[in-house]
Regions:
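Multi-pass, polyprenyl lipid-linked donor-dependent membrane glycosyltransferases
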Residues: 113-117, 132-174, 181, 188-199, ...
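Transmembrane-helix signature of polytopic, membrane-embedded enzymes
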Residues: 104-109, 125-147, 308-314
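Signature aromatic-anchored transmembrane alpha helix within multi-pass, membrane-resident enzymes
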Residues: 220-224, 352-381
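Transmembrane-helix motifs of polytopic, lipid-linked glycan transferases
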Residues: 109-132, 295-302
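Transmembrane alpha-helix segments characteristic
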Residues: 304-325, 335
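Short hydrophobic/aromatic helix or loop-helix immediately within or flanking a transmembrane segment
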Residues: 60-101, 265-268
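Loop-to-helix entry region of an early transmembrane alpha helix in multi-pass inner-membrane enzymes
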Residues: 82, 86, 90, 100-120, ...
Length: 383
């Protein structure tokens, strides 16, 4: 009885109807990638070249950053891994405790966490959007997220899905005025990714606009504690509370330690795209980065004109700008996945298009999703 009240069957089924085909499509992409696309090389493969070669259908989901999360989950932090926040690998570690010596088991636990988190995120995002928007718009936003060219990261051994869930739960309980849970989920989110600190600013705006009682702000103040706790750990372990930031120039050498103005970043990309040939193997990635970098700056601005909630827009705009001012959009196609307000604005725009254009959008986005997921599965850098 309680579960029926908390989890309406119709909503569950509606999301399941779109989630299962999405997972099947990604598995088919993996199948064709393994059989028809050569490996990019021997590095950055999930589990290392030996494990990947023996079981590519499992370890392809743990390429690039996935290797680090699995290593932290099994062995704790090693040199140069402080850029990866602790909550996701900690949960993998706890749930895989009886089987930690099995790399396959740890990987399966990581995938289970990501996929369950993403499904729950879709469910609560639908409920969150229904506070202000129709069923049609809410459902359309979910479809747009699922079809996004880098949405495969939600199903991989990455912390995107977990953070996405935590961020949505934070906003959801803010709209329900359950501020204790806002503080708890926001605090955990801030220890999951550095983007969690943006929730603090966004929720202050939400509380101010809602004219909540002064005592509710106490719970919002819990949010930064997640990041502060990780900074204290880094201070004790490596004598650098900002190691997660300083290591960005090592794990992502395309990033710079200073602040680069956004127009400079756009100019760099325009110059690269005009001077690089179409035969360049990373040209398609550069185009994706530039389009995402431009779109996700414009979408919050359009959202303001569409009267989207200010707290949502703050989360979307600051969440885009925070990594972009390091001088590159190199990981932007993945970073923007958690910026649900931008997808909301995109959903509003797509909803206003003629039917033929809507179909065209989803066909194009779906093709790009399959294309980039296949590249990722075979060890090519995507985001």
């Amino acid at each position: 009885m309680f579960l029926n009240k908390f989890w309406p069957n119709n909503t569950f089924k509606q999301i399941l109807i779109i989630y299962i085909p999405w997972r099947l499509a990604l598995f088919l992409a993996l199948f064709f990638a393994v059989n028809f696309i050569p490996l990019a090389g021997k590095n950055f493969l999930g589990g290392g070249i030996g494990n990947y070669t023996a079981n590519p259908y499992l370890f392809a989901w743990a390429n690039f950053d996935g290797e680090h999360y699995l290593s932290i989950a099994q062995f704790g932090y090693k040199d140069l891994e402080q850029a990866f926040f602790p909550i996701y690998p900690a949960i993998i570690h706890l749930l895989s405790f009886p089987w930690q010596h099995s790399f396959i088991s740890v990987t399966l636990i990581g995938l289970l966490i990501s996929n369950i988190s993403f499904f729950l995120a879709l469910y609560f995002l639908f409920k969150l959007l229904r506070f202000d928007y129709s069923v049609r718009i809410s459902y359309l936003v979910l479809l747009i997220i699922l079809a996004f060219p880098t949405a495969f990261y939600f199903a991989s051994v990455y912390n995107e899905a977990l953070f996405f869930l935590l961020a949505i739960l934070t906003f959801y309980f803010a709209r329900k005025k359950r501020w204790f849970w806002v503080g708890i989920f926001g605090m955990v989110a801030a220890a999951t990714r550095v983007f969690g600190i943006i929730l603090f600013l966004a929720l202050l705006i939400e509380a101010w606009q809602g004219r909540v009682k002064i005592g509710s702000y106490f719970w919002i103040l819990l949010i930064p504690l997640g990041l502060i706790a990780y900074m204290i750990y880094q201070w004790v372990s490596v004598a650098d509370p900002l190691a997660f930031y300083h290591l960005q120039t090592i794990v992502g050498p395309q990033h710079e330690s200073g602040i680069i103005l956004l127009p400079q970043v756009y100019f760099r990309y325009i110059k690269i795209l005009l001077t690089s040939g179409l035969s360049n193997p990373i040209y398609s990635i550069m185009v994706l980065e530039f389009v995402v970098g431009l779109s996700f700056f414009i979408l919050p601005i359009i959202g303001f004109l569409k009267k989207v909630r200010l707290s949502y827009l703050a989360f979307a705009l600051i969440g885009f700008l925070l990594p972009s001012v390091q001088g590159s959009f190199s990981s932007a196609p993945r970073y923007v996945l958690i910026l649900f307000p931008s997808f909301l604005v995109l959903g509003i725009i797509v909803d206003g298009l003629p039917k033929l254009f809507k179909i065209g959008y989803f066909i194009m986005s779906g093709i790009l999703l399959i294309f980039f997921s296949m590249l990722f599965f075979r060890g090519y850098w995507v985001a």
